[in-house]
Design a protein with these regions (language model features):
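Aromatic-residue-lined binding/catalytic grooves and analogous aromatic/hydrophobic interfacial grooves
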Residues: 366, 405, 450
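Conserved, charged catalytic cores of large soluble enzymes
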Residues: 1-14, 30-204, 243, 247-248, ...
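A glycine-rich phosphate-binding loop feature that marks nucleotide/adenosyl-phosphate handling sites
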Residues: 125-129, 292-294, 344-348, 379-384, ...
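Basic, alpha-helical terminal appendages of large translation-related enzymes
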Residues: 1-3, 43, 47, 119-124, ...
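Generic structural concept
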Residues: 354, 358, 386, 390, ...
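Non-transmembrane, amphipathic alpha-helical segments
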Residues: 345, 349, 381, 397-400, ...
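Structured secondary-structure scaffolds
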Residues: 1-40, 45-46, 98-102, 149-150, ...
Length: 513
């Protein structure tokens, strides 16, 4: 059986997750569910990045210890992932003892190889990013250096610290980016490659003085320092599947891994991560999937921008996790930023889920119950419907294997529209025995339900159980293979949402938290 390891970034739990976190996590979950559906053995990892100055300050603000703070926030994140029906196999925390041991051992090994050394450093530092910015990387606001991500003033820091010899890996990183297809879409690899060629690679700090950042994993040979949060966090991808602790499981899954990240952390996940892996004699990941930003009010959605959209708003408004997941995945774009408005999300939900899919399921279910007492036996499927089903399945599998979830959903919608056109043309409600038409419609609904199941797992389960069919791999789907549909109810899956009040500008914006 083919193995696949899927990861999200691990998230800073300094605040509850919002739509930006959900955007990444739901996409990774859809990939995991799809790959399980087609028969692959999947291990899906997500979790929290729990060390560093930002966490330390957040805990101080609440008057509790960092450990108490991250314990509380781990529970919060897990609750949100339950809310969105995220099917992770393991939730990693960088305060887990096994992870801390792996990080400590990796740091020690690189020091013994001469790849980590001690030196003085001075530079502009962003607490939120937990990294230094060199000239050319930060932006000037009123002649003061600001973080290009968070738009906050940078802090000038001078300290003696430990460095990783990133500069020694320029040729390796260049070759990896230019000669492999690891980074997807490939435009992101070109972006990093251009920067590497223009600027070269500088050695990077991998530790902080303990008197400034006490909340971290101690440097194993120097207790006056803690390990830099990015070095610590990146290693979760290997510690989470057994590196240095369970070699059999590590070998089972690595390097057949799909990392899913946002483009804001591209540099660390290419240049730094690939170099760390090479330094530790670990093969690079099979795929680094990079997605664009969700934009609201012209800015990347984020707490610092004050434009976050709460996850609970999405789940409540779109009738549960399935509706929220579908809207996010239809918006999903790997290489173009997406402007988010309630009007846009409402339109997607109402037209595609409530009307095209939900209404069709309801109409066919009610008709079958009324006309044939819910029992629809196998008949020859209408040729046009059969062709539409097979075309949609073929394109859907191609798109999903190519990691293009939104495009795959468009193929499902085309089939849904064809089925709605068919029911209006053949008018089964006017026939005394519409079994042939109903069977064709039910085969189409079965195909749509199978294809939507990674995105709308709860609704797909309800429909398959209510109509009496199994959710099979889209690769194994055979039109006309169901002997009998036994419809026990016609569920109302997705109730339409009503327009909210408009803002003074006339355009509706989601609530922020």
């Amino acid at each position: 059986m083919e193995r696949l390891y899927i990861t999200t970034p691990i998230y800073y739990p300094n605040a509850p997750p919002h739509i930006g976190h959900a955007y990444t996590t739901v996409y990774a979950d859809v990939l995991a569910r799809y790959n399980r559906l087609v028969g692959r053995k999947v291990f899906f990892l997500t979790g929290n990045d729990e060390h560093g100055l930002k966490i330390q300050r957040a805990a101080e603000k609440e008057g509790i210890t960092p450990k108490e703070f991250v314990d509380k926030m781990a529970g919060v994140y897990r609750q949100y992932w339950v809310m969105l029906n995220i099917s992770y196999d393991h939730f990693i925390r960088t305060t887990d003892s096994y992870h801390e041991k792996v990080v400590s051992e990796a740091f020690k090994r690189l020091h013994e190889k001469g790849l980590i050394y001690k030196a003085k450093y001075a530079g502009w530092y962003c607490v939120d990013c937990e990294r230094y910015y060199s000239p050319g990387e930060y932006v000037l606001v009123d002649d003061k250096p600001h973080c290009p991500i968070h738009n906050k003033p940078l802090e000038w820091l001078e300290e003696e610290t430990y460095y990783f010899k990133l500069s020694e890996f320029k040729d390796y990183v260049t070759k990896t980016l230019s000669e492999t297809d690891i980074v997807y879409p490939p435009s992101y690899a070109k972006e990093v490659l251009n920067r590497v060629q223009a600027e070269g690679l500088r050695d990077v700090s991998v530790a902080r003085p303990k008197d400034r950042v006490a909340w971290g994993i101690p440097v194993p040979f120097d207790p006056d320092y803690t390990i830099y949060v990015w070095f610590d966090a990146l290693l979760n991808y290997v510690s989470g599947i057994g590196y240095l602790t369970d070699d059999a499981r590590f070998q089972e899954y690595w390097p057949n891994v799909h990392h899913v990240i946002g483009k804001d952390i591209l540099w660390f996940h290419t240049v730094v991560w690939f170099s760390l892996l090479k330094a530790l004699d670990i093969s690079p990941p099979r795929r680094l999937i990079v997605h664009s930003f969700l934009i609201n009010r012209g800015l990347k959605i984020g707490k610092s921008a004050g434009n976050v959209i709460p996850i609970e708003f999405l789940v409540e408004r779109y009738n549960g996790s399935d509706g929220a997941r579908y809207v996010l995945m239809k918006l999903f774009n790997l290489d173009k930023d997406v402007e988010v408005t309630i009007d846009l999300m409402d339109s997607i939900y109402n037209s595609e889920l409530a009307d095209t899919y939900g209404n069709l399921v309801r109409r066919v279910g009610v008709l079958a119950a009324k006309k044939v007492k819910g029992k629809v036996y196998r008949r020859d499927v209408d040729k046009k419907i059969e062709e539409s089903i097979e075309t949609a399945l073929g394109k859907y599998v191609e798109d999903m294997e190519s990691l293009e979830v939104s495009k795959a959903l468009s193929e499902v919608q085309e089939l849904g529209k064809a089925l709605n056109t068919y029911i209006n043309e053949v008018k089964p409600w006017e026939k005394s025995d519409p079994s042939k038409e109903l069977y064709s419609l039910l085969e189409g609904i079965r195909a749509v339900t199978v294809m939507l199941s990674p995105v709308t797992p709860r609704a797909s389960t309800v429909i398959s159980e209510s109509f009496g069919f199994k959710l099979v791999s889209p690769r194994d789907f055979k039109v006309g293979s169901v002997e009998r549909y036994n419809i026990v109810e016609a569920p109302i899956l997705f109730r339409k949402v009503q327009a909210r009040r408009e803002s003074q500008s006339g355009e509706e914006s989601p609530p922020s938290s």
